[in-house]
Amino acid sequence: MKVKLEGREYELKANGRFLLKYQEIFKANAVVDLYKSISEKDLLLTEKLTYCAINEELSFEEWLDSFETPLFLMPYMDSILEYLIVGVDPSVKAEKKSDEKKTTSN
């Protein structure tokens, strides 16, 4: 998944490297924190998860400091979390967006 944050494009990957990087940097379980971030809409956890899903040379703190606003991730939070959860938990299916309303017949 590609995401553009304040004019910079990043490629996100939800793979084994993502899980390992998260564990090494934040000493926490990425899958547990991913579910927590989704349920609590936790911006800091989402930033940590996003940072580990991209290939960034800067430290986490330097990466955060490179953005103009602390809310740079807010517009993309839901789509990033959905991408990451589908990548790490195969039992989760991405939501299909549809303009059609479902109807049932009796």
Regions found by a protein language model. Give the residues of each.
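Active-site-adjacent beta-strand anchor residues
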Residues: 12
